[in-house]
Amino acid sequence: MKSLLSLLIVLILTQVSFLNAQNSVARDWNDEILEAIRNDYARPTVHARNLFHSSMVMYDAWAIFDESAETVFLGKTFGEYTCNFNGIITPSNTNEAIHEIISYAMYRLLTHRFKNSPNATISLDNFTTLFESYGYDTMITSTDYSLNSFAALGNYLAQEMINFGLQDNSNEQNNYENQYYTSQNEALILDLYEDNSLINPNKWQPLAFDVFIDQSGNIYALETPEFLSPEWGQVTPFSLKSEDLTILNNSFDSYVYNDPGFPEFIQNSTSDGITDPYKWNFALVIAWSAHLDPTDDTLIDISPASLGNTAINTFPTTFEEYQSFYNFTEGGSTGSGHELNPITGVAYTSQMVKRSDYTRVLAEFWADGPDSETPPGHWFTILNYVSDHPETVKKFGGQGAILSDLEWDIKCYLALGGAMHDSAVNIWGIKGYYDYIRPISAIRYMASKGQSTNTSLNNFDPHGLPLIPGLIEIVEIGDPLAGDDDSNVGTIKVKSWKGPDFISNPATDVAGVDWILGTQWWPYQRPTFVTPPFAGYLSGHSTFSRAAATSLTQITGSEFFPGGIGTFEVEQNNFLVFEQGPSEGFTLEWATYQDASDQTSLSRIWGGIHPPIDDIKGRIIGEKIGKESFDLAQQYFTGTLSNTSISTHKISTEVYPIPALNTLHVKTQYLEEITLQLYSLTGKLIFSKNIKNHQGILDLKLDDLAQGVYILKGVSKSNSLLFQRKIIK
């Protein structure tokens, strides 16, 4: 697969001759961080944070000289970290000062964040090259801006962001290592095709590789990758709200925003296993895998005339609605398409393409394959493409004055960066708590068990795969899969993409689709990557993409790509990386940002990475995050934000003693009406006490409280979170 960036470069070179000779300084540095992400370890959570923090730094460097805007970090308390700022003179040329502050801040911050990258030499050299191309001096390292040095202010801003990042609960100081999480399942050794029937079928299973190549192409020998960022829900967010936070415990405290509830757990089927939502979800993944056969000449219209335009109010909530929303047999989901291009007033032209080519291309296009800038970076790249388009009018939100390139980029990056970071915090908190299984483990598990449809057969098992003629069947005597001495007779076979065992040279070979043993099922991926190393529920792609699409819709003031269509050319036999293909060239097309987002979600099912249960709730949460991030960013842009109105601006508070006996003391700088709420670790409210008149010292009597661990929250009259502490009695 070519990365999205490569496609956009081709598009820009061939269709977008309008590019300015010189980008804004914010765009220059954004391009640098995207390239550094491609050269780093594949860590969507870490890089969403890097993109947000860098966007926040650049925004603050601009905002200090703007008459209306309010800084996010500089001179504020963000999370529980206070970044002091004593002010600086306003120069006669603010653009030059902003350029200098941004460059020094970004150079120092990115050098720190990527110093341990596997390709640190390349990235750090790139940072230095850009920095020195502006005429700046790497030897200026002072952070004392009291003499009105803009270079020093940039260094100071970077150092403060570095310090903040060392206490924002990301565990950056220990290379983001997990502190509490342990997997409940032993690793699946992929190539041995061993029995996988002894795992917990509702929990994530690590994968063991002879050679593992991560999403950015880094090679590891004899590797079993750990769960990436299962504790990320506790990282300081941008716009996530305290009232949407629940602290749950599954062997460690999980900070879960917008709790989606439990996924589908496997049922003990007594007959007709396909009626079990769990089995239906993973059987659908098998069914869609059968679409990846280039010898299948089934044609579908992939133009906006037929695809897209799926309203959020049509998203399923019940099992029956899921069965109607996703087309089990033919693939895809509901969506009426668009009758007309609203920009041109002309109908979209039909584009008939082989389903097998489209589904394979889509799976690779959005996959986190090698050389990926990860999903948050993908959407920054799309944002930059939109910004460069000749039909884009840079009115923020589609209203008001046309902005300079710098102001446009600065504001876009903060809004999108906040949405991407909050998506990572939200979804990885959910992933860490629910710890849900991936298709490769679930399908191999059920196939190891047997079948769950016919109770009269000796291979019936309540946890087996449901039998579906032409898709999931039993190996009979004489079957090509029967094996030596009929050793496989009675086992389960599935009709799916055959997997990497049938590919010697990806440039010339095609695995195709055929019957394979269910215990040897593979997602459509490279054998050195297979599936991202973290739980499936909920889908990061679905959430990142929906949040980004919502952000872009609000940023531009339009649902539609510039000109009413976004197009990406796919060359015959010069796109796929997992195997040869596609067999014909065609053009990927999307009318709206949300159409692209929805196709991203479906691509993960065709690729065998997610079942439907991982998808929809991620889209819904992503929509919410995109709106909330944009709304909060707008408040900063217009200077209408109150420091106590959002969850990330918390009040300095001491809670002691810990552990407490019968009395807990709370000392706070917040002197207005306050409500103290005590919660169990399961999120149950134990008691709530409203205090109107106090001098900043509050006492709580705990005589009747059972021994244990609790969460104490302080909430303002406007229901904003002031502080949150874990306490022990």
What residue spans do the PLM features occupy?
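C-terminal outer-membrane/trafficking sorting elements
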Residues: L5, Q15-F18, S645-K729
